């Protein structure tokens, strides 16, 4: 559940602990009347500082555009530096995270961006770009068609991040060597 919904108490209170992941996704993220759906779809608009292009940036990230130039191309913006400021604002608010390859720490062109919030990452990967299909198909058929085939890969990314963090903590605390 964490890979999809994250750790927010607000979101986790809306989940049914007895339900499967599929059932919770259908009842919350795919239900336009649920507080979880409203949270994911309206978060950007709650803070005007984040509003400018944020939704379009999230959409680009949800479509596997991870590098700055890929985001820039997806948005079709001119190279004025405004996008860099917007990404910095989203990174400062911890909505986006920036990763730099360990072997190229000073190469900004190799940096990638991702949505930090698992729920937003899920929403912009599967739901946002397919909202009309959700309305036509209904939640269950939408899940089976758009989410189920890719869910394992989506969850794997979060699992890899958790494993990396675990080993990093083990090495820093001196409990593990040679990693």
Language-model region placement:
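A short helix-loop-helix "switch/interaction" segment in the helical subdomain of ASCE P-loop NTPases
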Residues: 1-12
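Accessory nucleic acid-recognition modules appended to NTPase machines
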Residues: 11, 15-17, 23-179
């Amino acid at each position: 559940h964490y890979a999809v919904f994250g750790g927010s108490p607000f979101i986790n209170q809306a989940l049914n602990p007895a339900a499967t992941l599929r059932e919770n996704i259908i009842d919350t993220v795919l239900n336009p009347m649920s507080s979880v759906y409203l949270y994911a779809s309206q978060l950007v608009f709650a803070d005007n500082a984040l509003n400018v292009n944020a939704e379009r940036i999230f959409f680009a990230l949800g479509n596997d555009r991870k590098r700055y130039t890929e985001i820039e191309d997806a948005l079709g913006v001119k190279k004025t530096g405004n996008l860099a400021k917007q990404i910095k604002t989203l990174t400062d608010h911890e909505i986006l995270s920036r990763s730099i390859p360990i072997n190229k720490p000073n190469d900004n062109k190799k940096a990638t961006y991702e949505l930090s919030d698992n729920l937003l990452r899920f929403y912009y990967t599967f739901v946002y770009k397919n909202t009309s299909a959700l309305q036509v198909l209904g939640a269950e058929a939408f899940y089976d068609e758009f989410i189920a085939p890719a869910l394992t890969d989506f969850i794997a990314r979060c699992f890899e991040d958790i494993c990396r963090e675990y080993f990093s903590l083990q090495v820093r605390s001196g409990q593990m060597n040679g990693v």
